[in-house]
Amino acid sequence: MAAVDSFYLLYREIARSCNCYIEALALVGAWYTARKSITVVCDFYSLIRLHFIPRLVSRADLIKQYGRWAVVSGATDGIGRAYAEELASRGLNIVLISRSQEKLQMVAKDIADTYKVETDIIVADFSSGREIYDMIREALQDRDIGILVNNVGVFYPYPQYFTQVSEDTLWDIVNVNIAAASLMVHIVLPGMVERKKGAIVTISSGSCCKPTPQLAAFSASKAYLDHFSRALQYEYASKGIFVQSLIPFYVATNVATPGSFLHKCPWLVPSPKVYAHHAVSTLGISKRTTGYWSHSIQFLFAQYMPEWLWVWGANILNRSLRKEALSCKA
């Protein structure tokens, strides 16, 4: 009995001496909870401010804000074409750049007829290296370029392990995903700085959020574009230039395999037209955004989840996409 009493007294003494530590831990827990709560509220406010409020107010005058002409690379399909059409719907004249003259002429005519704006085309294969840029520079030199959209890019035929990717594809990723955006900015930025206004939109990818297995080179090239855009914003914001890093997740383009299960979730995987309509409304508001409300929710989850969980999910998704692509080939 005496032993029990002694233990009870000892326990009380230890508990009394630990009270200050328990209170300190409670304060730390309260601070952490408050901080996370404030972060969630701020993220929710940002989501509303970016993706819903702009749809309730009158559209910004992009011509007055940036200039009369927009240049869109990779403009004959997918996000590039949809973005060009959305800018044209707001009255901007469009210079379309892509490698297929036939497609360029068709898209340029469609845009001119539908939106009653001027269009021009530049036939350029960005995978051919530096030789095309003098021609592009000459074609754009007399234009009042207000907006540059760096959309052109190449993707793997389907998710693959790095050693399975061909050397040609790796060179295309360097030349098209990385070099094209860098050199297009180098061409148009001096004119924007001289006029003290302009916008540069560079389309990265949600795969740049964290290391993405089976898309190693592609996701790394998109991470370059994200960091490049953010650094440019810091360099040139004081000169009147708005630089936006656009980080879409899956959009229903050729990148998401036609017939894929991804196309069955339109609220999660929007059409290029829907995506571009939302993305353009964020221009001038957010320097770094996914461009679409459900993608912003995905981006928030990606930011907060541990890297191992991202890698696990990416492996499952990319294995499914590879299996589906290979079964379609068979």
From Swiss-Prot:
Disulfide bonds: none annotated. SUPFAM superfamilies: NAD(P)-binding Rossmann-fold domains. Residues 2-82 are annotated as: Required for mitochondria translocation. Pfam families: adh_short. PANTHER family: INACTIVE HYDROXYSTEROID DEHYDROGENASE-LIKE PROTEIN 1 (PTHR44889:SF1). It is found in: Mitochondrion. InterPro entries: 17-beta-HSD3-like, NAD(P)-bd_dom_sf, SDR_fam. It comes from the Eukaryota. Keywords: Acetylation, Mitochondrion, NADP. GO terms for cellular component: mitochondrion. NADP(+) binds at residues 74-80, 125, 222. Belongs to the short-chain dehydrogenases/reductases (SDR) family. 17-beta-HSD 3 subfamily. The keyword NADP applies. Interacts with STYXL1. This is Inactive hydroxysteroid dehydrogenase-like protein 1. The modification N-acetylalanine is found at residue 2.
